[in-house]
Amino acid sequence: MKPDLTAEFAKLAPWIFQFRIDGRDYGGAISAVGDVRVERFFRFAPKAVTILELGSLEGAHTFILAQRPGVKRVLALEGRELNLRKARFVQELLQISNAQFEQANLEETNLAAFGKFDAVFCSGLMYHLPEPWKLISQLPALAPNLFIWTHYAAEADAKIVSEGLRGKIHLEGGPEEPLSGLSPTATWLTLDCLMALLTASGYQSVELIYDDPKHVNGPSATIGARRESP
């Protein structure tokens, strides 16, 4: 006898993302299907076979990445245990075997322990971190390709937030707010500072793929960074 999926999803509520199971939609109101950020990622890193996803939330993008032809493995890191439970629940329903979910506080975790990858997919995370430069400094050693979608600080709103870096402090909702970071505040760097920081961290090529300074939630940018393989 098949379980009542509506009731099973309700046990893990609230949900952010919507998932289609056997032709029916469950979960939240937002569908990741057709998200242009995923398509831009694969245009940027078309040969990525192994992918590290940073900040996977409920796994909606993880499953789309994993189902892409040619992708053999996606390791998705997420800070909230409830989100991991949700992602693994949906993973079992969708029977996706090449995705793996692990809990990690990306404000402080040493990512080297997770190994090396062809590409890093970092969408919707960077602007939730109090010290994003600490994460960025680790990334060149993990993969030659880095894809970022993030909000950034407009220059008019910026001040010095760390040595040599300009940005603004953004209030977060805390651990109980599912779309917030884990700390009370986050740092939004200016776009110029973010791109310069990527170069200083070891990427030989940093490309502004798309800039949306009028985004409803604050200026946002899609960035691709590459380093030469050793």
Please describe what each predicted stretch is.
Residues E58-G70:
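Conserved SAM-binding loop of SAM-dependent methyltransferases across substrates and taxa
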Residues E108-F114:
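Short conserved loop adjoining the S-adenosyl-L-methionine
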Residues A87-R88:
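Conserved SAM-binding loop
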Residues A29-A48, I64:
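Conserved alpha-helix/loop element of class I SAM-dependent methyltransferases that forms part
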Residues F121-C122, P130-S229:
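S-adenosyl-L-methionine-dependent methyltransferase catalytic module, highlighting the catalytic core
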Residues R80:
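Conserved SAM/SAH-binding beta-strand->alpha-helix loop
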Residues Q95-E107:
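Conserved SAM-binding strand-loop segment of SAM-dependent methyltransferases
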Residues A48-L57:
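Conserved class I S-adenosyl-L-methionine
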